């Protein structure tokens, strides 16, 4: 399989998000990279599904709570940004304070 660097990066994000989701399902608290991967994957898939930037900015804040992540992670994670491909082109999606 021949993947471009961009495709490799997207695949890595989705694999990391899958690992994070499995750990969360087992009751483990997520670390920083796992939390970022889970939120980023949600944003990428939402864009692929045709959701709007505004919808994703709101839903990106509902995925994780303080109880889902290790201590100190909400304070470390101020923004999650990703360039996502929407039906009408690529757009930057920013989720401010994604863990509430």
Swiss-Prot record:
It is found in: Cytoplasm. The keyword Cytoplasm applies. Pathway: Nitrogen metabolism; urea degradation; CO(2) and NH(3) from urea (urease route): step 1/1. InterPro entries: Urease_gamma (IPR012010), Urease_gamma/gamma-beta_su (IPR002026), Urease_gamma_sf (IPR036463), Urease_subunit (IPR050069). Pfam families: Urease_gamma. The keyword Transit peptide does not apply. It catalyses: urea + 2 H2O + H(+) = hydrogencarbonate + 2 NH4(+). GO terms for cellular component: cytoplasm. Heterotrimer of UreA (gamma), UreB (beta) and UreC (alpha) subunits. Three heterotrimers associate to form the active enzyme. This is Urease subunit gamma.
